[in-house]
Amino acid sequence: MGGTFDPIHHGHLVAASEVADRFGLDEVIFVPTGQPWQKADEPVSPAEDRYLMTVIATASNPRFQVSRVDIDRSGPTYTIDTLRDLRAVCGAKVQLFFITGADALEKILSWKDLDEAFELAHFIGVTRPGFRLSDAHLPADTVSLVQVPAMAISSTDCRARVSRSAPLWYLVPDGVVQYIAKRRLYQQ
């Protein structure tokens, strides 16, 4: 599951769990982006903080793992590089699924080396409350959409809540709330 995870929240975790169940996945590898190319003009927390929050959030689920593959690579993070690296680690016999939000999937036609990406993995777009995928040009054999239980939580809202000293409890895992406070993330 790729994402910025700035911060990771319960919506991400529920989505990963639902997709793992529906597709019979042995494990879900969370891959926090290093330098997200789509967010070059937006402030993003340090990769190490986002990685550690993801480790904290996923620690209690034995099916969840976290990879440093993107944050250890220099330069902008492209999904194709992530998939190539995961293929090298997992081997050719393992079927890869790339889980992302449907809003990110809507922009997939602009992604780097898209044809190769479709050869390397099956893409799963997780629908969020109120979101409708408007692009009908996605190949049905390599892209699936999955509706998950409605959880109107976003990382953007979580950051805004912290910046205005609003409670974050129960939107993100407890350990992530504590990590954000300790590192003083998202405070202006």
UniProtKB/Swiss-Prot annotation:
Q: What is this protein called?
A: Probable nicotinate-nucleotide adenylyltransferase
**Matching Pfam families, A to Z?**
CTP_transf_like (PF01467)
Q: What is the lineage of its organism?
A: Bacteria, Bacillati, Actinomycetota, Actinomycetes, Micromonosporales
- Its EC number is 2.7.7.18
* Entry similarity comment: Belongs to the NadD family.
A molecular function (GO) held by this record is: nicotinate-nucleotide adenylyltransferase activity
Give the matching PANTHER family.
NICOTINATE-NUCLEOTIDE ADENYLYLTRANSFERASE-RELATED (PTHR39321), PHOSPHOPANTETHEINE ADENYLYLTRANSFERASE (PTHR39321:SF3)
General function of this protein = Catalyzes the reversible adenylation of nicotinate mononucleotide (NaMN) to nicotinic acid adenine dinucleotide (NaAD).
CDD domains found in the cross-reference section: NMNAT (cd02165)
Query: What pathway does the annotation place this protein in?
Result: Cofactor biosynthesis; NAD(+) biosynthesis; deamido-NAD(+) from nicotinate D-ribonucleotide: step 1/1
- Keywords of this protein's UniProt record, alphabetized? ATP-binding, NAD, Nucleotide-binding, Nucleotidyltransferase, Pyridine nucleotide biosynthesis, Transferase
